[in-house]
């Protein structure tokens, strides 16, 4: 099964998240997309928004797009690391994972925990984000 993962703090969730989810579903023929909500992105400043509100807001943005599921895995896998989520999802399922991100995240992807392993275990899909294309194309990850 081909699935997409859009991970993040979703603080706030917005139409851009929905747009890249729809585009990824169409372009890569994904059966479902998981919005994996985290309490805190380790590379961003602290969020004061409760996880329950983030999940509620994500569901509001998603609306009737039933191919998108909002999940909070940190209480299950005891981690907010992307590699731990990927390992958890692949453990009992035959998933082909497409990890979706905006160009702003590509800039610092080399700083993510086990970023090389992430890119070996799933397909990384980067979407342009206004104002970030130039810097993302200069990033250490892009140059590799």
Locations of the language-model features?
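Nucleotidyltransferase catalytic core that binds NTPs
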Residues: 1-144
């Amino acid at each position: 099964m081909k699935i997409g993962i859009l991970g993040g703090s979703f603080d706030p969730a917005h139409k851009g998240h929905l747009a890249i989810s729809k585009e990824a579903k169409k372009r890569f023929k994904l059966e479902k997309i998981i919005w994996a909500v985290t309490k805190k992105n380790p590379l961003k400043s602290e969020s004061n928004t409760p996880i329950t509100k983030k999940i509620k807001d994500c569901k509001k943005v998603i609306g009737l797009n039933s191919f998108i599921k909002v999940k909070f895995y940190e209480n299950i896998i005891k981690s907010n690391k992307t590699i731990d989520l990927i390992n958890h999802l692949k453990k009992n399922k035959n998933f082909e994972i497409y990890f979706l991100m905006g160009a702003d995240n590509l800039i610092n992807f080399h700083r993510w925990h086990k970023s090389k392993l992430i890119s070996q275990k799933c397909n990384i899909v980067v979407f342009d984000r206004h104002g970030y294309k130039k810097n993302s194309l200069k990033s250490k990850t892009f140059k590799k």
